[in-house]
């Protein structure tokens, strides 16, 4: 089995430590260089009711769970990979890319889009909105984005989103198109990677989505025909959202996050799924999330991010220019005084070296001619 298949297999709770040690031995046979120093130190945490959470004991005595190892390696979360696998090299981290491609792991694309969306909402807070008024205001503050999206609407071609739905241009206005796309996001998704994980096919798991947008248009969203873990619709699935409280749980899903606290209703065991498949909860989009999903963050700002960077440079240059001019003036005056001093030293009064070396004047004596007496 491949590295990510073996890593997925240990992403579950165990009845005892010995069972995990056995599975981890199999994992080590497929572990690439740079990662064995951590995976060679298996450990467990007793979380009660004969359940043991598997993981690894780091050199600083910190415990990291197998679910966290799965999450950071599948997401290509380089900062956290470096934090866990101390001293790992760039080539060793890059080796995971090929292993992900072998198993069609799709997670890293979602992680990249989520990271981009978070940056959009942080740097341009006006995009963190879900109302028509908020979207209109965000478009007005970002004219390049507005112009580009308007051109997309003129083209009329729908765009597939990470949630499996489409950004369609069928409403009377661009703002309403955006609101419709936002309303069709949020929930539990079953994701299957294709073409080395570069393409992801996602569908919405309605029975694991405990809070749907009231304006969700199911005809514009791909609904899963069955549940990949509970295909026979047992009571465990049909009753999953009983007692759901969004204000307490702060998420729209249950049974959709393999990295969640095992005692929370959000946790799910996906260890039986192939490495190229996963379940994930995606919270309802804001306009900023939509911009990040579409990869249009480069258009934000009055002149886009590039123009914004140029404006920052111009601002810095403007502040430094008076200082630069002052320094230049001082240097110029100093140069003038230097030449004046040199001139005075060379061409000044007698004495000294100058007098000793001055050339001797040439004196020309003019004599009257001697008269001659003519013979008489």
UniProtKB/Swiss-Prot annotation:
Glycoprotein recorded as keyword: yes
Keywords assigned: Glycoprotein, Late protein, Membrane, Transmembrane, Transmembrane helix, Viral envelope protein, Virion
Residue ranges crossing the lipid bilayer per the database entry: 154-174, 320-340
Domain of life: Viruses
Entry GO terms, CC: membrane; viral envelope; virion membrane
Cellular localization per UniProt: Virion membrane
Glycosylated residues (UniProt): 183
Keyword Glycoprotein: yes
InterPro entries: Baculo_ODV-E56
Described function: Structural protein that plays a role in the first steps of per os larva infection.
Other facts noted in the record for this chain: Expressed late in infection.
Similarity annotation: Belongs to the baculoviridae E56 family.
Protein known as: Per os infectivity factor 5
Chain's gene name: E56
